[in-house]
């Protein structure tokens, strides 16, 4: 067991921390530099005595991998790699960067805790309506003629994207189960810092033969909430670009929120206070976690303010 000095496994709280894309950058080089700072904030939480599970986005990374393999395939210098495999590859190299940076930062502080990354599969329902209405553009841009040719051969859906060309679109189904849940829970209980469910997890469906990867994008915050509930975490922490959630955002009457309950969060969501592409999915994930874990709470804040947020000094807390 790897509990911190003065802590027991019974007194330590488990938190699931969802990193926003701003913590990772858009290229491997930028990511490696940014993650050094990210690691410091994460180790601050460990130093406070928390057991930490880290999830992260992978939008720019998986997109870059898909574009690269598409290009290689188009020019006859490499295979076209399926999207689920691109997701697995992104989990691998993001996990490697996080694992290495955190191991180094823990060593600098003389904290002896192993860090491990888990390639994670997330089960989705093959009958999820999202598969009938794919909306998430991924991969390379194509001409209209090439896109239509690919649609005829594959049955995939391509759409025109902002005048820049045609792109493949995939579904964004809801996560129902994380295949490696028990493994992640065991690692946490043994004292490991765990990086898991990157990019919302690799989407899989259940078939007669077992699990099978599918082309889809799962919202990372939804998966983080599911993971937090299933491993019985005490808190879900979603890190983003702002210190606090606000209503009337960017208006003269903007109001930062310190603590809101589930009903208030739902009311503000219904009023359209939260942008669908940014804050709304984070609020929804927090509501889902707190509804299923009434004794737990969720926190939304920035990476820089995470430690103070956990101490109740800043950030927005969502409670039952």
Feature map (PLM): residue ranges:
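Short, Lys/Arg-enriched N-terminal segments with co-localized hydrophobic residues
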Residues: 1-11
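C-terminal catalytic "cap/lid" subdomain
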Residues: 10-320
């Amino acid at each position: 067991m790897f509990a911190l000095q003065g802590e027991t496994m019974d007194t330590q709280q488990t938190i699931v921390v969802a990193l926003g894309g701003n913590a990772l950058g858009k290229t491997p080089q930028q990511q490696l530099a940014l993650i050094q700072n990210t690691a410091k904030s994460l180790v601050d939480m460990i130093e406070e005595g928390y057991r930490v599970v880290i999830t992260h986005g992978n939008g720019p990374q998986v997109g870059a991998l898909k574009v690269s393999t598409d290009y290689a395939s188009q020019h006859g210098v490499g295979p076209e790699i399926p999207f689920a495999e691109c997701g697995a590859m992104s989990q691998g190299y993001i996990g490697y960067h996080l694992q290495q940076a955190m191991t180094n930062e823990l060593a600098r502080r003389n904290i002896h805790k192993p860090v491990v990354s888990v390639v994670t599969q997330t089960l989705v329902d093959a009958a999820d309506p999202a598969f009938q209405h794919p909306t998430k553009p991924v991969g390379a841009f194509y001409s209209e003629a090439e896109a239509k040719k690919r649609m005829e051969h594959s049955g995939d859906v391509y759409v025109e994207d902002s005048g820049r060309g045609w792109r493949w679109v995939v579904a964004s189904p809801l996560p129902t189960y994380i295949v490696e849940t028990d493994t992640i829970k065991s690692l946490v209980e043994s004292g490991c810092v765990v990086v898991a469910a990157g990019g919302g997890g690799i989407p899989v469906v259940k078939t007669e033969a077992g699990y099978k990867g599918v082309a889809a994008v799962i919202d990372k915050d939804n998966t983080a909430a599911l993971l937090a509930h299933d491993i019985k975490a005490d808190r879900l922490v979603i890190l983003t670009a702002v210190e606090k959630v606000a209503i009337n955002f960017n208006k003269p009457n903007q109001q930062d929120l310190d603590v809101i309950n589930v009903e208030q969060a739902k009311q503000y969501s219904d009023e359209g206070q939260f942008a669908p592409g940014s804050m709304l999915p984070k609020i929804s994930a927090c509501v889902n976690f707190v509804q299923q874990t009434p004794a737990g709470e969720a926190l939304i804040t920035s990476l820089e303010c995470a430690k103070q947020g956990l101490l109740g000094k800043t950030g927005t807390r969502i409670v039952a």
